[in-house]
Amino acid sequence: MILVDTSVWIDFFNGHQSVESAYLRTCISDAHPLVVPGLVLTEILMGLRTESDATRVADGLSGFDEAPPLDTRDSRKAAQIYRECRNRGRTIRSTIDCVIAQLCLRHGYELLAKDRDFESIAQVFPLRRVAIPMMVHDRPNPKSQQS
């Protein structure tokens, strides 16, 4: 199962051409199991301008699996991720990224993200990042073909 970070969803919804958003598009069309944590949903919805957009996006994302709720153990482990990275010279900029990394570590999710904080975390913890196949780079974006 793949946990998709906010950075990739934003590119996807905005039609931004990135390798990660192209891979997400492939995962959706191939019905690959994806998980959306509540924190990611919150971040996505915070960036939308209208309630109608927020409702439409929330409804669309509700079709994917929801990550299990956080517990105290996750909070402690996320703080540990931050401290251990900082102690190794890799300061993580986002508390939420530490929590998302912890969810991936705890539940065995692969992570699809663009955020450099996850690169730093993966240097210290066994965070599994999605290896995007080269052929995804060659797939056309359906939006770019519409005139």
Describe each PLM feature range.
Residues M1, A101, L105-S147:
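Acidic, PIN/NYN-like endoribonuclease modules and their adjacent C-terminal/linker elements
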Residues M1-V36, M46-D59, D138-R139:
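Short, well-structured N-terminal submotif of metal-dependent ribonuclease cores
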Residues V4, V36, P69, L112-A113:
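Short beta-strand scaffold positions
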Residues D5-T6, I44, A78, C104:
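Generic structural signal for small/hydrophobic residues in well-ordered secondary structure
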Residues W9-I10, L41-I44, F118:
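A generic structural signal for short hydrophobic patches within well-formed alpha-helices
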Residues S21, L41, A54, S75-A79, ...:
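A general structural signal for well-ordered alpha-helical segments in protein cores
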Residues Y23, T95, V99, D117:
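Amphipathic alpha-helical recognition patches that constitute DNA-binding helices
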Residues E66-L112, Q146-S147:
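Active-site neighborhoods of divalent-metal-dependent phosphate/nucleic-acid chemistry enzymes
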